[in-house]
Every structure is written in C-alpha cells, then in structure tokens.
C-alpha cells in the first residue's frame, strides 16, 4: 500500500515522522506518540496509544518504524478518499441538503434511474438502513450501509 505514495508524499511523511520521533532513534514509541497527540489537543489513554501502535506494528517491537508509519499513512489516505466518495454519493441522494435521505428523496432518485419500486419497497429500504428509527437515513447510516456491502 505504501508503494502507491509519491516521492513528495514520502518526503512529507518522513518530516512528520521526525516530529514524532523525539529522540531520533528511527522509532515512534507510545510515549512519543502521546506527547505529540497531547500537543495537538488530544488526550489519549495509555491503552489507546498502545492500540494505535499495535495496529501497524508489523514486527511487534512495541513501536512504529518508518515503513510501518508509511503503511499507516497510506491506509489513512485511502480511508479519507473513500469517505469523501461516500459523502459525495450521500449528497446526490440528499436533494434538499438537510443531512438526511427521506423516503421521498430515495424514491425520486430510484425513479430517475428507471427503478420501478412500490412505496412499500422504498419504505422497506429506508427501514433496513435506518438504525436510529427516525424514518430517514443520515450519513452514518448511509456509510454503514455501504460498508456492509
């Protein structure tokens, strides 16, 4: 995944890595990660820091080296791209821009692409995605729906 990064991105990530790596030993420890996160206004617990490190710590040494950092950043960028795509798709459905997809909006879109569904079918689609039972689909429900596919 890190192989999809440009030379410029890698150089920028090397600079960021150096900011985290306070003692310049080529590794980011939970202590160093915590220091940087706190300086950015975050307040992670020790276990959260350990979890963050373990998520990308391929060689299980309890710290993040630069290749592991690149992998983590490439994943984050990929997630961000797909989040942006999901948000764009959501806007297509959310015609009035109120942050929710109503049955009427879903019905309109499906009709405009040639789908012939009954009101009951559209209501059932909304019901399946509507986890908070407010009769509409919000961005979180929409994202969960797409992630389940």
UniProtKB/Swiss-Prot annotation:
| SMART domains in the record | EFh
Sites binding Ca(2+) 2 sit at 57, 59, 61, 63, 68
Describe the location of the EF-hand domain by residue ranges: 8-43, 44-79, 81-116, 117-149
Instruction: Identify the Pfam families for this entry.
Output: EF-hand_7 (PF13499)
Residues reported in the UniProt entry to bind Ca(2+) 3: 94, 96, 98, 100, 105
Q: Which InterPro entries does the record associate with it?
A: CALM/Myosin/TropC-like, EF-hand-dom_pair, EF_Hand_1_Ca_BS, EF_hand_dom
Give UniProt keywords alphabetically. Calcium, Metal-binding, Repeat
Which molecular-function annotation in GO is an example for this chain?
calcium ion binding
Signal peptide positions on this chain = none
Superkingdom of origin: Eukaryota
User: Would you name any one GO CC term?
Assistant: myosin II complex
* Annotated residues for binding of Ca(2+) 1: 21, 23, 25, 27, 32
Annotated residues for binding of Ca(2+) 4? 130, 132, 134, 136, 141
Instruction: Give a short account of what the protein does.
Output: Calmodulin mediates the control of a large number of enzymes, ion channels and other proteins by Ca(2+). Among the enzymes to be stimulated by the calmodulin-Ca(2+) complex are a number of protein kinases and phosphatases.
Family from the record: Belongs to the calmodulin family.
Miscellaneous note, as given in the UniProt record, is: This protein has four functional calcium-binding sites.
List the PANTHER family.
CALMODULIN LIKE 3, MYOSIN LIGHT CHAIN 1, 3
Question: What's this protein's name?
Answer: Calmodulin
Lineage start: Eukaryota, Fungi, Dikarya, Ascomycota, Saccharomycotina
């Amino acid at each position: 995944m890190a192989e999809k990064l440009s030379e410029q991105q890698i150089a920028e990530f090397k600079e960021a890595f150096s900011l985290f790596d306070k003692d310049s030993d080529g590794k980011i420890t939970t202590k160093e990660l915590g220091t940087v996160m706190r300086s950015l206004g975050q307040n992670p617990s020790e276990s959260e820091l350990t979890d963050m490190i373990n998520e990308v710590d391929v060689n299980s040494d309890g710290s993040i080296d630069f290749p592991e950092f690149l992998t983590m950043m490439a994943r984050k960028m990929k997630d961000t791209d797909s989040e942006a795509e999901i948000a764009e798709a959501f806007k297509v459905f959310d015609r009035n821009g109120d942050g929710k997809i109503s049955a009427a909006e879903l019905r309109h879109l499906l009709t405009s692409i040639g789908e012939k569904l009954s009101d009951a079918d559209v209501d059932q689609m909304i019901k399946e995605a509507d986890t908070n039972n407010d009769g509409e689909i919000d961005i979180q429900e929409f994202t969960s729906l797409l992630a389940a596919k």
